[in-house]
């Protein structure tokens, strides 16, 4: 079958089965075209509970599918490709978190959504890159242990100088490879371009940005801006998607190595096979995980909404 034929079959089967397809913005264009909703982690979290359907196929990584299941326990949820995991979500385990909590006993524990559901059971609230500042500001506690991404944590801390932060030494393996030198090279090559960056990048990179925001924030800024050229400091799929949606503008990756292969493992055939009952992985979580992670995730939606 051609790509177009596979897409048509997916559209037909998802309608027949009352299935909603959610796709993270880092997925390929051919996947976004069959999705009912595309966006960043926060948008996917909200849509998971809002969508009126009997089942959800998540085209993203494991923690996203788990978050979807926690927010929609009555729905069947599948991860389109079972091997799609997030390295950052796996950097800190429960034992490591408990050791950190012992070091900072009077700190509120704020988890980036890029964490396992098990880890979320022992956190006060989780956040996304688009909601982190707002949620941390609303917390009653003045001391915050931010896990696992110190880059996003430092960005939030700069916005909230009235609060004290402690961090874990984690981070996104892709975003942290971007250096200030990469930015300098990109600006030299494209002197008229604005630099838009994700806060998962290192401080030295974020400090040079014309705009700092989540994946959705970056895309919305670029679409609405009167400017015509942009250097994009996040996963390189966003360059592709923005160029597709804004053909009158020019978009350049800040670094060629900013490609998340974990997101790229999901294919159209994964979705097709999942709908056929021949692929994907249905998500099941123990009751204690559903309840503990649910408390953390629902508080995120409550404070960030």
Protein language model annotation of sequence segments:
Residues 1-232, 238-305:
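Active-site loop-to-helix "anion-binding N-cap" substructures in soluble metabolic enzymes
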């Amino acid at each position: 079958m051609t790509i177009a034929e596979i897409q048509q079959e997916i559209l037909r089967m998802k309608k027949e089965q009352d299935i909603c397809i959610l796709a993270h913005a880092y997925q390929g264009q051919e996947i976004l075209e069959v999705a009912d909703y595309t966006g960043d982690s926060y948008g996917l979290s909200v849509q998971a509970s809002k969508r009126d359907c009997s089942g959800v196929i998540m085209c993203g990584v494991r923690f996203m599918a788990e978050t979807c299941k926690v927010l929609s326990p009555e729905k069947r949820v599948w991860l389109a490709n079972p091997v799609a995991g997030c390295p950052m979500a796996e950097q800190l385990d429960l034992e490591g978190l408990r050791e950190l909590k012992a070091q900072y006993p009077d700190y509120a524990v704020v988890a980036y959504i890029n964490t396992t559901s098990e880890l979320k059971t022992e956190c006060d609230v989780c956040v996304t890159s688009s909601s982190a500042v707002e949620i941390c500001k609303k917390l009653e506690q003045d001391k915050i242990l931010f896990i696992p991404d110190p880059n996003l944590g430092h960005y939030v801390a700069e916005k909230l100088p009235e609060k004290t932060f402690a961090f874990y030494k984690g981070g996104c393996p892709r975003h942290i490879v971007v250096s200030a030198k990469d930015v300098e090279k990109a600006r030299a090559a494209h002197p008229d371009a604005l630099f838009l960056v994700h806060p998962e990048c290192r401080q030295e990179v974020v400090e040079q940005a014309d705009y700092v925001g989540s994946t959705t924030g970056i895309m919305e800024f670029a679409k609405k801006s009167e400017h015509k050229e942009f250097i994009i400091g996040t996963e390189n799929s966003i360059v592709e998607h923005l160029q597709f949606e804004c053909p009158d503008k020019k978009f350049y990756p800040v670094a060629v190595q900013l490609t998340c292969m974990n997101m790229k493992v999901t294919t159209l055939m994964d979705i097709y096979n999942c709908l056929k009952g021949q692929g994907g992985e249905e998500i099941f979580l123990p009751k204690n995980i559903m309840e503990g992670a649910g408390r953390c995730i629902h508080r995120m939606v409550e404070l960030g909404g």
